[in-house]
Amino acid sequence: DGGYLDDAIVKLTPDGEILYEKSVSQIFIDNGLEHLLFAYGSFFDPDPIHINDIQPVNFDGEYWKKGDVFLSLAGQSMVILFRPSTEEILWKRQKNIFYQHDINIINEEEISIFNNNKRLFYQKKDYIDGHNEVLIYNFKTQQVSSYLQKSLEREDVRTPGQGRGKILSNGDLFVEETDYAR
């Protein structure tokens, strides 16, 4: 009722001691993206961020460093790569992802994103445009591809909320279609 949900990221020790804490709204403000928090015209969204997934980076590479984090922000239909040590958003993607969830690091230059393809219409009615998909973003080529799209289409995978997609080491795709319990 008139409130504002401000998600945050927190790094804890195994004993629960807080090592780092930062409001995602403040991350946006510090990186010149404040306009995205209030870009709804006359409609007030009390949850403009809504973190769906945080994927920590556990190794150094050309495009990220150990300690960086990928954030899946459903309220923005955005994925960002954030570096807590400098408080800088290194990369962001909003194109052709809708209320996405799970992010996984595949290798030194690729991530996967579970794209729900959910459209949210007036009065918050959900609609899935086709089916869910697992997208692969390649940082080297800056290209996006859809992984096993025909299989997801054939199986009619279309969870509007939640969901996971993990590419296994043998190339198989493990999918959790949460809202339909499969």
Positions of PLM-derived features:
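Histidine-/acidic-rich catalytic cores in large beta-rich domains
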Residues: 1-182
